[in-house]
Amino acid sequence: EVGHGPGIVLCQEIFGINAVMREKANFLAEEGYTDLVTDLFWRTELGIELGYNDEDFQKAFTLYQNFNEDLGIEDIQATLNTLKNLKECDQDVGLSVVGYCLGGKLAYLAACRIPELVCAVGYYGVGIENNLEEAKNIQGKLVLHMAEQDQFCPTSVRNQIIQTLSAYKNVQSYIYNNVDHAFARPHGMHYHKPSALIAHERTVTALRKQVGPDYDLEALWEEHVRFEFDTRDVKATMATMVAEPYVNHIPTLTGGVGYAQLSRFYRHHFVHNNPQDMTLTPISRTV
């Protein structure tokens, strides 16, 4: 954990900054990014945080129907300006926007209207077809994740979007088969974990290509195995992992979940139990 990284503005769904959006923000932070979630409904009510019952759905759709997209872009720009003044935000790599649902449409508009954006990613944005003429202004990378069965984006509309944007080499559109709107919302009724994981991987891949962070994974692995098998230093081995790691040695189903359990496993059952004359012989490597 270096305490800083490329800056991302995260744009909410129509349900405000709720537990789902905080979880999304944490995922991006774990990938090495400094991210801020924009409160898009602050002009109506500060800190709106809705769930997914019938009453909250109705309130969310009312907020959406009264939402001004132009003002939303102003809010994104203001959040980008705030990011640029944070010491945790890397200043020399450029800024990005990631959005879901309403935020997915705004991510598209931000790519069209904010020239400083290096990368924008939109998940199942609603209404992009109404602003396709603005695509000619996109200067950075744009990635769109689209649900094949999105009830808010019929097949004909989706095809129109993809056909129009296919003319731009810096735009990449992905279709996820047999899933509906909000397929990447954890715990939601349309959540589809395989599609969500693939979309997340594609999002992070696009971000890393455009703004980083660029990790030398091979060097990190070499350091990890050196501490684990050569110097046999448990604390140093643990330092090469994330804060709460998970290791499962498949043949014996041993290992640990979390720092405390895994550290205990290494200290008492693994690192110091390997033969002193053991050597490492690389066979293959996939990064």
Model-predicted regions and their roles:
Residues 104, 143-149, 155, 174, ...:
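C-terminal and inter-domain tail/linker signature
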Residues 1-90, 185:
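Serine-hydrolase catalytic machinery in alpha/beta-hydrolase-like enzymes
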Residues 119, 125-177:
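The feature captures the conserved acid-bearing segment of alpha/beta-hydrolase catalytic domains
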Residues 76-80, 158, 200, 204:
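Generic structural signal for well-ordered alpha-helices
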Residues 13, 100-104:
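Short, thiol/selenol-centered motifs that function as redox-active sites or metal-ligating centers
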Residues 87-101:
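Alpha/beta-hydrolase fold nucleophile elbow
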